[in-house]
Amino acid sequence: YTLLLGLLAALSLVSCDKQEIETYHANRSLFFERWKQTSATARERIDTVGYSFSHYVGETELTHEFQIKLIGALLEEDTEYRVSVVDSLTTATGDQYSLPEKLMFHKGMASDVLPVTLKKAPSLKDKQVYLTLRLVANENFGLGYTGYSDVKIRFNDQEVIPLWWTQEVTD
C-alpha cells in the first residue's frame, strides 16, 4: 500500500508541466451589428433605419450611431478603419449627410460606433432619400460576417406615421 501511494505521488509530480495557452491569432475584422432588442426576449434584424425630420421639430441635424463590432483581439491603440458610400444604393446628396473625417475604432473596446449626421434640406419635404454605407477592408481590419458590411438609412422631412404607431393609438 505504501509503495502504491509513493508511486502515485511520484507520477503526479512528473505529470505537472507548464504549457502555454493558445490565444486567438486571426486578423482583426469589423462588422455592423444588425440586431435590435425589441423586447426582453425578442430580437429583430434591422436592415434599414428610418428618420423623418417632421418628428424632430426644430432640429436641422440628426445623428444616428451604427454599432460596429470587432472580431479578434482587443486593440491596444485607437485604430483607423474605412467606410465608403455605396453610390448605386444611395440617393442622398453630399449636403444631406456627413461622416467623421477620420474613423477610429477605440482601444480596449469590442464594440464602437459610427456616427452619421443627417442634415435637413428643403428637398426632403418632397421625397425620401437613402444613404448606404459599406465597411471597407484596409491594412488594419478585414471584413467580418457576410451580409453585415452594409447599413442603410432612409430619411425625409415628410409627415409619416411613426414606427411605434399601432391601431391601439388610433382606437
Q: What spans do the regions from the language model cover?
A:
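Acidic/polar, low-complexity intrinsically disordered N-terminal segments immediately downstream
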Residues: D17-A92, P162-D171
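Short glycine/proline/serine/threonine-rich loop/turn segments at secondary-structure transition edges
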Residues: P122-Y130
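Internal, hydrophobic beta-strand segments that form the core of beta-sheet-rich folds
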Residues: V129-G142
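Bacterial N-terminal signal peptides that target proteins for export
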Residues: Y1-L3
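Ser/Thr/Gly/Pro-rich, low-complexity flexible regions
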Residues: G142-D171
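Short, hydrophobic beta-strand segments
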Residues: H106-M109, L114-P122
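Short beta-strand and strand-turn-strand segments in soluble, beta-rich domains
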Residues: S88-M104, A110
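C-terminal motif of bacterial Sec signal peptides marking the signal peptidase cleavage site
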Residues: S12-S15
